[in-house]
Structures are given as structure tokens and as C-alpha cells.
Amino acid sequence: MRIFGYARVSTSQQSLDIQIRALKDAGVKANRIFTDKASGSSTDREGLDLLRMKVEEGDVILVKKLDRLGRDTADMIQLIKEFDAQGVAVRFIDDGISTDGDMGQMVVTILSAVAQAERRRILERTNEGRQEAKLKGIKFGRRRTVDRNVVLTLHQKGTGATEIAHQLSIARSTVYKILEDERAS
């Protein structure tokens, strides 16, 4: 059984030093500590990717806190399941949680349920926000394309670029671009 450590910070205000010190105090050798400094939403985690390649069945990964392993609950659960499938246990120092043994399997099951509930909650909030935005008149999707012929017809009738832009709800620069393209052709 080899012991590895993983530490991650998601903002510049957070420090890896405290996490690394806790991992060393727990018996992890310095060359077996993998770290990432990235935003919480970033999926580019070189340290975690290296750790995934190094661990083997029977190994243990120590992490200072639950929230340091994954970007969110769903990500953390996915990683725990991935390591569990490899026969690798994950232990969280501060939280006193370990994924090995029968109790560990129960913890993984409970955390999976929490992750599923979190995904549903996020989906509900997203849909509520989308509905509220629609009620406020905010349009979704790609902007409609400008009918060049309408712009050219209005211009031929003597309508100015500013008025065309206003009538068609487009930028004046778009009107000028269409007129310029027409002159060039």
C-alpha cells in the first residue's frame, strides 16, 4: 500500500501550503503529493491527471478536505467512483471520511445521492432563470441574420443608415457593412 496526497486551490487567495503540510504530517512523502492551482470550473488539472496515472490497486489517496478533490459534489463523486473501481481508497483528513471498507461504500452511496440531488437542483435553478429571462423578453439562441435585401431596399428609398439600423434593430455598423459590400460587388 502506497500513500499519495492531492491538494487543490481554486483561487489565488487560497494557499496550497496548508494542505501540503497536512498531507506531510499524515505521512505522505513529498514526491507523492500532487497539486493543482486552477479555477474551480477548469477541467485542466495536470496534478490530478498525473495522480490518476500513478495510483494502483491497494493505494490510498489523502486529501485535506472533501471540497479539495472535486470542483463540485458531482465531480468529487465521479472521481471517488473512478478511484474505487481501481481499488484505490480516498481518505479526507479533516472530515474523517474514508472510502475503503463497508462504511466507505456507504459513504460513497450517500455522496452519490447528494450529487444527484445537487444536479437536479442546479437544473431546476437554470430552468427557473431561463423562464424568468423569457418573461423579461430576453431572447435565447443565435441572433437572427439580417436580410440584406431589406437593408438595400430601405437605403434605395432614401432611408438613412441610422434609421435603417433602428427599424431593423441592428447596429449601424452592420448597415454600413452591407452597403459597402454592395458597392464593392
From Swiss-Prot:
- InterPro entries, from UniProt? Homeodomain-like_sf, Recombinase_CS, Resolv_N, Resolvase-like_N_sf, Resolvase_HTH_dom, SSR_resolvase
Q: List the active-site residues.
A: S10
Enumerate the GO terms in the molecular function aspect. Answer: DNA binding; DNA strand exchange activity
Where in this chain does the record put each Resolvase/invertase-type recombinase catalytic domain? 2-137
Q: Which Pfam families match?
A: HTH_7, Resolvase
Name the keywords, alphabetized.
DNA integration, DNA recombination, DNA-binding, Transposable element
PROSITE patterns registered for this protein in UniProt = RECOMBINASES_1 (PS00397), RECOMBINASES_2 (PS00398), RECOMBINASES_3 (PS51736)
Q: Taxonomically, which superkingdom?
A: Bacteria
Q: Which residues bind DNA?
A: 161-180
Biological process GO terms, please?
A: DNA integration
Keyword DNA-binding included in the entry's annotation: yes
Name the protein family.
Belongs to the site-specific recombinase resolvase family.
The UniProt function text for this chain reads: Resolvase catalyzes the resolution (a site-specific recombination) of the cointegrated replicon to yield the final transposition products.
Q: What is this protein called?
A: Transposon Tn3 resolvase
Q: What species is this protein from?
A: Escherichia coli
What gene name is given for the protein in this entry? tnpR
